Amino acid sequence: MSSSLPAHNDKSPSRTPRAEAAPADAGDDFIAVLDFGGQYAHLIARRIRHLGVLAKVFPPLAATAELKRARGIVLSGGPRSVYGEDAVPFNPDVLALDMPLLGLCYGHQVVAHHLGGQVRHLDHGEFGKTRLRLRPGDTGPLFEGVPRETEVWMSHGDTVVRAPEGFDVLAETDLTPVAAMRHRTRPVFGMMFHAEVNDTPEGGRILANFVALTGARKTWTMERFIEGALEACRRQVAGRNVLMFLSGGVDSTVAYAPQAPGAQGPAHPGPVPAHRVRGRG
């Protein structure tokens, strides 16, 4: 099945991760996604939200005290090498937190590298649809309901070749001997593939299994998010009027509609001529 998402390339230029928090979510259970600069970090959060659980995106150096409030943590992909001089700064104390943790792609390498495993460079990398083979025996809760052989989406130049002490290898591919692993006594997991993209057909099931493992309450809905965002805007405006410039495009119109006076909002439209939007005047 072809994905409608762009092909992932963890060697693409990195971007500076930013913290993101949905408004009006105080008291809600949430899963933290640490963004190592991969283009799918926010997609991971979106997939979790679609499962009914709030997900928040944080930078890799987010305060441990803040992450302790989460019910689980996912480490995203990223374009760098965990052993390189330009490796994304990361607080390894996160790996000791008492909650389920899942590393995906670069995040998988982070778990392996910081806990004593081995990550090395592949001569040709591993990209695109790849056949994943689960090892015989118990492969743990995240692969529950997943066939012993399945297709996954790989996109990496480095790979994990040796799991850290205390981890069991759960799956392999022709190029990656440690395509998935889990700790024997703690709910810590790593997967070299991208469970969050459409080209991993069983990815949704794997993420759902992880969310279930966290025990997070399913309180997130789009309606609740929208109302929370609007309430946050109202608090920030605090009774003042707001002038919003509209180009007539989808983004500005959608942003304006719920804030319009007819919707009891504070915004007043300021149309922008098309030639100004296109930089012609």
What kind of feature is each model-predicted range?
Residues 2-75, 79-84, 95-97, 113-281:
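RNA-binding accessory domains that recognize and position tRNA/RNA substrates
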